[in-house]
Amino acid sequence: MALKRSNFFVDKDQQLKDNLILDITDLHVNFKVKDGILHAVRGIDLKVERGSIVGIVGESGSGKSVSVKSIIGFNDNAQTKAKLMNFKNVDITKLKKHQWKYYRGTYVSYISQDPLFSLNPTMTIGKQVKEAIYVASKRRYFQAKSDLKFALSNKEIDKKTYKSKLKEIKQTYQQKIKPINVEKKTLEILQFIGINDAKKRLKAFPSEFSGGMRQRIVIAIAVATEPDLIIADEPTTALDVTIQAKVLTLIKQLRDLLNITIIFISHNISLIANFCDFVYVMYAGKIVEQGLVEEIFTNPLHPYTWALISSIPEQKDKNKPLTSIPGVIPNMLTPPKGDAFASRNQYALAIDFEYHPPFFEVTKTHKAATWLLHPQAPKVEPPQAVIDNITLTKKALQFKDQ
């Protein structure tokens, strides 16, 4: 079985441009709960370039995970609406529940924050990696046949080309699922992710590995399917700092080697700074600032971004008290009027409590939704902690370029 993708192709004027792999417009995700409607995501746009690492950062409850789970149909009982969710020129808003399986785990892989719940405790790790290879290969084979048949019926190719390509597809599939080739690929992946004595460990169960190693195995399964996109949803939260660094380095190496696109979710803005190419800052179900990682950390513009950066522990003065953001995220059953961050924002203007700010564009890639960027707004300097961080970031970037 395969998904008849021709039924889900976007219109010609909506086709992806500029090396994009994902384009989401005006995404809303609501949940019907006992006390009413929970407005988890409130009209966000996301653009993701092929081969990039895109970070989404914000406090717990800001809507990060819900946003990306909508890309793989993981939000059970959610009311999801969007003007467009274009993944590789397929509008995934049109997919029915039973159709998600043709994309999930094949074209898009998901890495959760707790590897213990991602792995089957009754199956060896070798069997789990091999299963991912077999299932993804089979789905890609049937999908390729379906797409080829569509091309023939649409007169994009002639019968001779159809037969030739069909034979090629079948031969490729048969080679991929040969047990000897699956075993070889499994060993190569496990060795690459740092599993010592991989051939022997193929028969080991998840419980025989540490938390860091289990997360590496989850990454191995995600990569084994040869996806175009990997969603890493706080994949290092349950790991200690040294293991975090190793796992992030591994993910980056896989991106560079396989040209996989990665969406990285975190509440830790310092991880985002060291790992991502492009950043979306999210608060109360909305994007409040976005830009290249260099722009966000050398010229942060939204007070919420300032607050996140200010909360990074001071490296030089270890006796300096930690900075925290006062207050809590508002109740999304009844989202506040105006800017949702206004009640926690010491720089808030009167207009913030009445009207939500539009995006003010600073560069083609950098923009922020704050009234402080309005031409008539008073000039406000960011906190000293942010200014210090900007100085350090600029020095680090200069050193990196040398």
From Swiss-Prot:
Bilayer topology term: Peripheral membrane protein
Known catalytic reactions: a [peptide](out) + ATP + H2O = a [peptide](in) + ADP + phosphate + H(+)
UniProt entry tagged with the keyword ATP-binding: yes
PROSITE patterns: ABC_TRANSPORTER_1, ABC_TRANSPORTER_2
Role according to the record: Part of the ABC transporter complex OppABCDF involved in the uptake of oligopeptides. Probably responsible for energy coupling to the transport system.
NCBIfam families linked to this entry: oligo_HPY
Designated name of the protein: Oligopeptide transport ATP-binding protein OppD
Residues engaged in binding ATP: 58-65
InterPro entries in UniProt: AAA+_ATPase, ABC_Ni/Peptide_Import, ABC_transporter-like_ATP-bd, ABC_transporter-like_CS, Oligopep_ABC_C, P-loop_NTPase
Keyword Cell cycle: no
Recorded GO CC terms: plasma membrane
Primary residence: membrane
A single GO BP: peptide transport
Alphabetical keyword list: ATP-binding, Cell membrane, Membrane, Nucleotide-binding, Peptide transport, Protein transport, Translocase, Transport
Organism annotation: Mycoplasma genitalium (strain ATCC 33530 / DSM 19775 / NCTC 10195 / G37)
Location of the protein in the cell: Cell membrane
Family label: Belongs to the ABC transporter superfamily.
Quaternary state and interactors: The complex is composed of two ATP-binding proteins (OppD and OppF), two transmembrane proteins (OppB and OppC) and a solute-binding protein (OppA).
Residue stretches making up the ABC transporter domain: 22-309
Catalytic class of the enzyme: translocase
One Gene Ontology MF term: ATP binding
Catalytic activity, EC: 7.4.2.6
